[in-house]
């Protein structure tokens, strides 16, 4: 591995993995160049990045960060980094797999917010929707409850004012 190009690639991989809490290992074999380009674009739109490199280099870079994915790095593999929206990136992978009859790319495993996860967890993340969608749903739920709470407080205030007014008369 003393080859200069491999050393540069390894350094670049380590730099890319700095501060990354969520990533997925995927099998991309069977995608056409056009499909791979579209996948990269979709992932980039969700704040992620698709990295294709030799498994040995990917594994070395991951192991330096204390993350062992030797079991998932078999056959052609790519690393999908989810910097901003882990669920959105997982959904982009799921959508891309749904657009072709072979279900490619195939998720082999992942690392979500500091924990190694299996394929089922990544699929569950993909079904959640994007971060902004989840935030909008949360705001909607909270505002509905706050509105009800304000109504209750208003009714209680009116009741107290009514009792206070009848006592002074």
Swiss-Prot record:
One of its GO terms (biological process) is translation. It comes from the Bacteria. InterPro entries: Ribosomal_uL10, Ribosomal_uL10-like_sf, Ribosomal_uL10_bac, Ribosomal_uL10_bac_type, Ribosomal_uL10_CS_bac. Keywords: Ribonucleoprotein, Ribosomal protein. CDD domains: Ribosomal_L10 (cd05797). SUPFAM superfamilies: Ribosomal protein L10-like. GO terms for molecular function: large ribosomal subunit rRNA binding; structural constituent of ribosome. It holds the Pfam family Ribosomal_L10. GO terms for cellular component: cytosolic large ribosomal subunit. HAMAP family: Ribosomal_uL10 (MF_00362). Belongs to the universal ribosomal protein uL10 family. PANTHER family: 39S RIBOSOMAL PROTEIN L10, MITOCHONDRIAL. Part of the 50S ribosomal subunit. This is Large ribosomal subunit protein uL10.
């Amino acid at each position: 591995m003393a080859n200069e190009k491999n050393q540069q690639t390894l350094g670049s991989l380590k730099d890319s993995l700095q501060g990354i809490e969520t990533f997925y290992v995927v099998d991309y074999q069977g995608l056409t160049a056009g499909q791979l380009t579209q996948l990269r674009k979709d992932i980039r739109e969700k704040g992620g990045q698709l990295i294709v490199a030799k498994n040995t280099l990917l594994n070395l870079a991951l192991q330096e960060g204390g993350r062992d994915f030797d079991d998932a790095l078999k056959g052609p593999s790519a690393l999908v980094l989810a910097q901003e929206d882990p669920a959105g990136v997982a959904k982009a992978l799921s959508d891309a797999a749904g657009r072709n009859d072979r279900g490619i790319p195939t998720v082999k495993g992942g690392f979500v917010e500091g924990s190694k996860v299996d394929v089922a967890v990544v699929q569950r993340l993909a079904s959640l929707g994007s971060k902004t969608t989840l935030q909008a749903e949360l705001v909607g739920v909270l505002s509905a409850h706050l509105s009800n709470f304000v109504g209750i407080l208003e009714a209680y205030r009116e009741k107290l004012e009514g009792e206070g007014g009848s006592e002074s008369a």
